């Protein structure tokens, strides 16, 4: 049973969403199903084994990581073309089979980046190459640098120096409405701006 819960909605997820069940053998799987039936009466999706169950979680999380990298890279080009990426995505998601993802300052949290690197390391150990995932990780890791560049450009346009300037960071968690800051890209941005001499103030509503 791979852990699969959305931070901030853990109780709802455990009591409402279908759960994957896959043990090291059939007997273990039956025991796990009985425990779930006793604690959480939700739909159980039986997998052939625990390896397959974990592969489902890895696939869904890496899918998101890759697609966030895709739209983030698109946004860098659209920015130069004077195109509002959010307008593009809002229109695109009206198409029934388009799964919208949004660009940002990077990807953080305890799952997406780690799961991508987990798959990359596994593939490397097997002599395989997951080039799309590897490229996506590089894109997402670089996005904080773009935010810093945008900030520096804005100061330059205003004929101001970042050094000794006060900058307010609104939100440092890796996603809205949670207190978790694991691997948040905001930390890279904050550290770099502090290195440049900025006075950083943080507020996360």
Q: What residues fall within each predicted segment?
A:
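Structural/interface elements that position substrates and couple domains in central-metabolism enzymes
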Residues: 1-205
